[in-house]
UniProtKB/Swiss-Prot annotation:
The gene is algL. It is found in: Periplasm. This is Alginate lyase. Catalyzes the depolymerization of alginate by cleaving the beta-1,4 glycosidic bond between two adjacent sugar residues via a beta-elimination mechanism. May serve to degrade mislocalized alginate that is trapped in the periplasmic space. One of its GO terms (molecular function) is poly(beta-D-mannuronate) lyase activity. Disulfide bonds: none annotated. Substrate binds at residues 66-67, 139-140, 257.
Length: 373
């Protein structure tokens, strides 16, 4: 007796669907398409090699003063003296972050081997020294660790996935660097995992971004899953009006900190989406709600003043770079024409904590100028 064709097809299609699901779970992690861009040119001839003296690998205690030292629990009043102490004590770490980002951008533009070698030498030296791995840390110290990891790993992703394969002849350095990134990411997970909700704020989102960038750089599905978990915790804190209760506590800096929460969340959602995990609808599209609330607040800060009773400090929000999150955000959601117009007026967005030039990655047709951070 012959079975009808549709009865034969049902289990076959089910099997295919299950197979596709398992393949997706096992597929190597990847970044968004813009990270596959080739090096623009391979320039030759004389040039000024600006590979400075490498900052010495930071292997000391991660006990740093907070720039809000002495402030009340709102952590909203800057302490100029302690901020200077913080900047001084973390200068070598910040130089590594900024110069890695800058040099990767230069290499992707000019293709000079000296630019690549400088970056890899610095990262390899810090990796060999097990830098930034101290177990003696305070809140500011563990914050520096995850910021630095996010900066380095997200810049490195541009090298690793470029269609020009610049790391092909640098296997040994790549292995050392990636092993160090993995150790740092494991420590970041330990530093920030399972915090009580009242202590989960923008810091946790930035920690999750650093772990997401590392997961793609090193193909670690466990790190990817942790970043997704933390993202969900974060966007489930967004209320139905688009506010983050823990950032509203920052008084006159509430709007700034809502804005500061958006870059890591938007990048995580973007990286997750290309790996088959769609987070856009989480908590009724909470990320979209948060982004829209911030854009409305920038236009009319009284929205936030009415919510928490404090006139908002708009100083930070006058810098174009603070809106770099619009690049991934406007690929995840449909941005209104006035938002797109504003985005184009501020481009290119270059920010070292997200790995460099996001306009080059997400909106390359609008790449222009030499702005950057």
């Amino acid at each position: 007796m012959r079975l009808p064709m549709q009865k034969l097809l049902i289990p076959t299609l089910l099997g295919l669907a299950m197979f596709a699901g398992s393949v997706n779970a096992a597929a190597p992690l990847r970044p968004p398409q813009g990270y596959f861009a080739p090096v623009e040119a391979f320039k030759t001839g004389d040039f000024k090699n600006d590979c400075d003296a490498m900052p010495p690998p930071y292997t000391g205690s991660l006990q740093f003063r907070s720039k809000y030292e002495g402030s009340d629990k709102a952590r909203s009043t800057l302490n100029v003296q302690s901020e200077k102490a913080f900047r001084d004590s973390t200068a070598d770490i910040t130089k590594l972050e900024k110069d890695t980002s800058k040099r990767v951008m230069q290499f992707m533009r000019d293709g000079r081997p000296e630019q690549l070698e400088c970056t890899l030498n610095w990262l390899t030296s810090w990796a060999k020294a097990d830098a930034l791995m101290s177990k003696d840390f305070n809140h500011t110290g563990k914050s520096m660790r995850k910021w630095a990891l996010g900066s380095m790993a997200s810049a490195y992703v541009r090298l690793k996935f470029s269609d020009s394969h610049p790391l092909a002849n640098h296997q040994q350095e790549s292995q050392l660097i990636e092993a160090w990134f993995n150790k740092l990411a494991d420590q970041v997970v330990s530093d920030w995992d399972n915090l009580p909700l009242e202590k989960t704020n923008n810091h946790s989102y930035w920690a999750a971004w650093s772990v997401m960038a590392t997961s793609v750089a090193t193909n670690r599905r466990d790190l990817f899953d942790w970043a997704v978990k933390e993202y969900k915790v974060g966007v489930n804190q967004v209320d139905d009006q688009g506010f983050l209760p823990n950032e509203l506590k920052r008084q006159q800096r509430a709007l700034s900190y809502h804005n500061y929460a958006l870059p890591p969340l938007s990048m995580i959602a973007s990286f997750a989406l290309v790996n088959g995990v769609d987070l856009r609808q989480e908590n009724n599209s909470a990320l979209k709600r948060l982004g829209d609330k911030v854009l409305a607040g920038v236009k009319d800060p009284e929205i936030f003043e009415k919510k928490n009773g404090k006139e908002q400090d708009m100083k930070d929000l006058k810098e174009d770079m603070k809106y770099a999150w619009l690049e991934p955000f406007c690929t995840l959601y449909t941005c209104a024409p006035d938002v797109i117009e504003r985005k184009h007026g501020m481009q290119p967005f270059k920010t070292f904590r997200l790995g460099g030039d996001l306009t080059k990655v997400y909106d390359p047709t609008h790449e222009k100028g030499n702005k950057g951070s």
